[in-house]
């Protein structure tokens, strides 16, 4: 399905019921179910409701006594939805692996990467299918340099701040439930973000204001 026709982020934005913001819209959810293979959408929603997703923020400014959680959500809103962040936000998207003893899963929607086995599997398959004469970049990334063809879709978009070109990762070739879940959360709407982080409190936003703890987080991921 062409990204010129379907704007996935706008569909994600409609996931929360407009008449009751404590519920998901079943019609939109059913529609999205058929738009992704391997039951990816169902697995992504299950992940969002699993309490296994975490957003860690290196927080030097907003970690105040009192309304800390709300202020952290505001930081995410500024970064992902308003584009009004005054400085580069340092954050990490982490999923707790359900396998005992396995390291946490690192998710990077900005560069369309995930450390999970599913992502690695499809990435290696793409490598094996790629002709040596063809650049992997051309196989996995859709580059748009015609302004008339620019899209408002933010799903699987790389470097969204560029004014001269747009790049989209071809998610139909490589996608996993972790990337889809965090994209639904951070590339949709403020209502969807707050639905999972505040209303249902299933996705946890955690501030780290100590650089040693921040570095330790990365060590745990590598291990």
Swiss-Prot record:
Keywords assigned by UniProt, alphabetized: DNA damage, DNA recombination, DNA repair, Nucleus
GO cellular component, one term: nucleus
GO biological process, alphabetically ordered: DNA recombination; DNA repair
Disulfide bonds: none
Subcellular location: Nucleus
Superkingdom of origin: Eukaryota
Coiled coil (residue ranges): none
Sequence similarity: Belongs to the SHU2 family.
Subunit text: Component of the SHU complex composed of at least CSM2, PSY3, SHU1 and SHU2.
Function per UniProt: Plays a role in a RAD51/RAD54-dependent homologous recombination repair (HRR) pathway to repair MMS-induced lesions during S-phase. Required for error-free repair of spontaneous and induced DNA lesions to protect the genome from mutation.
Protein name: Suppressor of hydroxyurea sensitivity protein 2
Organism: Saccharomyces cerevisiae (strain AWRI1631) (Baker's yeast)
